[in-house]
Amino acid sequence: MSRADQLFVNMCKEILTNGFSSEGQTVRARWEDGTPAHTIKTFGVVNRYDLQEEFPALTLRPTAIKTAVDEMLWIWQRKSNNIKDLNGHIWDEWADENGSIGKAYGYQMGVKYKFAQGEMDQVDNVIWQLKNTPYSRRIMTNIYNFQDLSEMGLEPCAYSMTFNVTGDRLNAILNQRSQDVLAANNWNVVQYSVLVHMLAQVTGLKAGELVHVISDAHIYDRHVPVIEEMIKRPQYPAPKFRLNPAVKDFYDFTTADVIIEDYQKNPQILNIPIAI
């Protein structure tokens, strides 16, 4: 059975059984009909994924892996803040009339800073360090720029990555301030797992662990029945994953270089309402 499924089920059970409900509290998020979107939450969730053991895609329901990877590349590779550069409609609600989400996500990745080795952006700094000083304890990114928050369509949810090399393994910690568990949990796990694999390949390393730290892991009130049904579904082995081995430059990767095989999964859950 998929380890990712087991972690997801355990997390959801913990939230539903011991989580804190925001009912009666003032909340920002709203459903499309204007109703307050309340949640049940757990503070400080930590899930560990061994990327050598399996590729952590859920089998409880399908994850659109290529679409998730495209969003990750939109941020990390294309460093774009315009949804016209994205092959999906995930960000439509947060974009302005020109398609911009402001100074968020990809915009922050493209900002250049003066590092000891020269002027470059955060992504290039990570790649440079992994190639030249892989055992450094300072290999990280952070896109939660307080100065620019007022100009962001959405403040970053997944906001920092810390990379750590142990032997020949590239490990990473993904820090997330908030997560809609049903809509986004496996989406984020999949895309950052692929990122670790890609960075490992272009720097001569092997993918190790992805540790996902979520400050506020929550299930929305209208998602509770969906989650309760979903976690009772049968679980299947994780799909097989590989990257095109010919790619040696991070900026040459496309979604076509991500190969997923034997992905056995349950039916998709359609028309999931999203709180905004």
Residue spans for each PLM region:
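Terminal, non-catalytic protein-protein interaction segments that mediate quaternary/complex assembly
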Residues: 1-276
